[in-house]
Amino acid sequence: GAQNGISPQEAQERIRQEYHAVQHTLNWYCLDYWGERLGLDICAMTSEQGPRAALREDTVPFLEALKNSGKRRILLTNAHPHNLAVKLKHTGLDAHLDLLLSTHTFGYPKEDQRLWHAVAEETGFDARNTLFVDDNEAILDAAAEYGIRYCLGITNPDSGLAEKSYARHPGLN
């Protein structure tokens, strides 16, 4: 704020406005975009926070149960590839997945129907027999709109925050 001649409150309001202006677009998730807009090294800041990344205690048993049932385990994330790499480095999640896809590779976020068509073409997944789990109702809506039959919301994706509820999808802790 001060380096731009505005108060911290004005800076916060400008960032909030920018944040809302790109909500539900790929830029909302893009570290490069925010680094350029804010003049900060967001990738370095993300790397510094890497040790905070942790898996829920039920994640690996769930993924292994899917594997043992013959199910393909695909992570589709809106996370920027750098952010994803940092999280994987600190969690080892990739060892429990068959495929990892960043929406940045496709050029569309999960909120965009074009992404679902591109991912289906890339992976051959059958929407009628797919379980999709997310913590964002708009994304669950987009998956359901595409035709994914089983959409499930995670009610406590961040143990440091209050539990979430979903208006249009079943939720699971």
Residues covered by each model-derived region:
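Asp-based, Mg2+/Mn2+-dependent phosphohydrolase catalytic module
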Residues: 60, 64, 71, 80-81, ...
